[in-house]
């Protein structure tokens, strides 16, 4: 008997009503491992090192697929090594950036939920607000650069890494908002929104995971955007100063004078209007199975050991209803993940494949009992939610956590990327790096 729910998208989104922001768009990014492999095969990092800091640079845009485990860092590295075996310099800088993702995952592994709070004392004494100003939430700050970044975030679910740092610096330092609020906004809208890279990068900008806070000036934005926004800007630019002047302005006292009147009336982002989520139907009768695979949203690949080694097990993906009600995703994020589920299920031989909505522990427990399953398989990941779900399931079932190969082995506490890179570069590159040290910029 085959039980496959991969073609029930409309019903799924009805059940997810209230768990997402916005609605369907004609040009959202397609998800799934098939699309990830297509993008990887088409990518040439030859000019990456030279253009990566420009917002029109030749970046890979593989990060959404890496974040959801549709591709692995090792697969990307090995593919490029094989494709360009005699041109190591071609991808050295790109591999360094892959290592940032590996580094941030190690940060999450080490700190867990601690990554949600300041990892270090702030390097300044400026107070921060827990409210995002309304003009920011509406993408109407009056600054063409910031509004352009917000338009890309809200409508496209993508921001170039340099633009992410600019916006984070703007929100934290020029508007005086806690980094956690910005990290939450990015998680909701970015296709690659996650805990590790996202929260650690925001802390790097704030200066709670770096030796000093990051900020930019007008020249920096202008130079790396080809004056895309500056040419049309008619307002007094808050970034138009040299770095010493901005440093004094931002960190010698309160940043409140740079906040608009809208900020005084701002509401927390979690007060955004939401619909009520309908409870899912009871799970229908299923063919018995002793093994159940829980596919979480960071392990969506048919090459993942967890599914590859268990072709006869039942497979389930659970949309985490409590988490999505607390922090709804943009519609395009859910559509991307749904694409990933469809693509995964089409490429798995397993006969029972389900997509469910609810509390993962409750739904997996109910499903396991329906199947008569005694063993639940999970792919390893440092996300605390994955770890905690596995721990709760162990109270009732045999849980097998399948190990995930990582790009590097680095036992020490991951405090600074520069120290990490000195130790792991040869693991990533296969040789000692030839280029100078790079900053996370």
Language-model regions, residue ranges each:
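Active-site-adjacent helix/loop patches that line small-molecule binding or acyl-intermediate pockets
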Residues: 103
């Amino acid at each position: 008997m085959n039980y496959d729910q991969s073609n029930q998208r409309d019903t799924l989104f009805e059940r997810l009503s209230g768990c997402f922001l916005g609605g369907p768009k004609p040009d959202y990014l397609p998800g799934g491992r098939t699309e990830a492999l297509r993008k990887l095969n088409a990518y040439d990092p030859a000019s990456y090192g030279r253009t990566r800091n420009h917002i029109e640079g030749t970046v890979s845009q593989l990060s959404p697929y890496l974040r959801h485990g549709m591709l692995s860092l090792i697969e990307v590295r090995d593919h490029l090594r094989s494709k360009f075996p005699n041109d190591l310099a071609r991808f050295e800088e790109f591999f360094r950036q892959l290592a940032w993702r590996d580094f941030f995952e190690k940060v999450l592994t080490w700190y867990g939920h601690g990554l949600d709070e300041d990892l270090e004392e702030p390097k300044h004494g400026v107070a921060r607000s827990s409210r995002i100003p309304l003009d920011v939430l509406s993408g109407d700050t009056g600054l063409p650069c910031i509004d352009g970044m917000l338009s890309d975030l809200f409508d496209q679910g993508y921001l170039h890494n340099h633009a992410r740092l600019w916006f984070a610096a703007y929100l934290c330092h020029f508007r005086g908002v806690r980094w956690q609020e910005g990290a939450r906004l990015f998680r909701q809208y970015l296709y690659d929104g996650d805990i590790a890279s996202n929260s650690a990068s925001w802390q790097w900008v704030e200066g709670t995971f770096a030796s000093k806070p990051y900020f930019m000036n007008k020249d920096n934005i202008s130079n790396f955007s080809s004056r895309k926004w500056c040419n049309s800007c008619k307002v007094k630019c808050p970034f138009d100063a040299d770095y010493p002047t901005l440093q004094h302005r931002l960190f010698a006292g309160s940043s409140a004078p740079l906040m608009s009147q809208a900020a005084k009336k701002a509401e927390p982002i979690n007060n955004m209007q939401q619909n009520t989520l309908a409870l899912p139907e009871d799970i229908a009768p299923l063919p018995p199975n002793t093994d159940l695979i829980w596919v979480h949203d960071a392990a969506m690949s048919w090459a993942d050991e967890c599914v590859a080694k268990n072709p006869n097990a039942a497979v389930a993906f659970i949309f985490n209803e409590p988490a999505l009600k607390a922090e709804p995703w943009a519609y395009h994020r859910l559509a991307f993940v749904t694409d990933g589920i469809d693509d995964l299920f089409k490429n798995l031989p397993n006969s029972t494949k389900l997509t469910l909505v609810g509390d993962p522990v409750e739904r997996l427990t109910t499903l396991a009992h329906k199947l008569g399953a005694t063993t639940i398989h999970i792919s390893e990941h440092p996300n605390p939610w994955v770890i905690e779900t596995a721990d709760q399931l162990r109270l009732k079932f045999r849980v097998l956590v399948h190990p995930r190969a990582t790009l590097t082995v680095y036992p020490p506490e991951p405090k600074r990327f520069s120290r990490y890179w000195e130790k792991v570069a040869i693991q990533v590159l296969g040789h000692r790096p030839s280029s100078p040290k790079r900053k996370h910029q």
